[in-house]
UniProtKB/Swiss-Prot annotation:
Organism superkingdom: Eukaryota
Listed name of the protein: Peroxiredoxin-2
Other remarks on this protein: The active site is a conserved redox-active cysteine residue, the peroxidatic cysteine (C(P)), which makes the nucleophilic attack on the peroxide substrate. The peroxide oxidizes the C(P)-SH to cysteine sulfenic acid (C(P)-SOH), which then reacts with another cysteine residue, the resolving cysteine (C(R)), to form a disulfide bridge. The disulfide is subsequently reduced by an appropriate electron donor to complete the catalytic cycle. In this 1-Cys peroxiredoxin, no C(R) is present and C(P) instead forms a disulfide with a cysteine from another protein or with a small thiol molecule.
Organism: Populus trichocarpa
S-S bonds: none
Length: 162
């Protein structure tokens, strides 16, 4: 399957998270994105070094600037279960704007065409690192990394697209 690209309509799918009452919720991507300007970024794994020390902190630090440019939601997805994503989100007490969503079986990652095979590293199927700018379901920017790189999908890169 070809990776998601500029001009594509973001596919719908289900992701999971824990709400403020600590209840497990399943949500459709379209319900989060329709009619809004959204950043959807994906990482290979929660608690992994580049994801935890660079990618996520960049979006947390730049959230105010992104929101000032019309972004209404900043969504982080990873091929992890919702319990892991909840724990990872809690490791960023300063975070007020980034929502952490689980794609436990990589179903949504597959729908985006962004799977990354990390079986030889013991991690199974994961997501390529990426950042999408989506406006009312239409992809306006698709910054997709090759392999495990971190060169085009940062918050600063998305800011240039706004």
């Amino acid at each position: 399957m070809a990776p998601i690209a500029v001009g594509d309509v973001l596919p719908d799918g289900k992701l999971a998270y824990f709400d403020e009452q600590d209840q497990l919720q399943e949500v459709s991507v379209h319900s989060l994105v329709a009619g809004k300007k959204v950043i959807l970024f994906g990482v290979p794994g929660a608690f992994t070094p580049t994801c935890s020390l660079k990618h996520v902190p960049g979006f947390i630090e730049k959230a105010g600037e992104l929101k000032s440019k019309g972004v209404t939601e900043i969504l982080c997805i990873s091929v992890n279960d919702p319990f892991v994503m909840k724990a990872w989100a809690k490791s960023y007490p300063e975070n007020k704007h980034v929502k952490f969503l689980a794609d436990g079986s990589a179903t949504y990652t597959h729908a985006l065409g962004l799977e990354l095979n990390l079986q030889e590293k013991g991690l199974g199927t994961r997501s390529r690192r990426f950042a999408l700018l989506v406006d009312d379901l239409k992809v306006k920017a698709a910054n997709i990394e090759g392999g495990g790189e971190f060169t085009v999908s940062s918050a600063d890169d998305i800011l240039k697209d706004l």
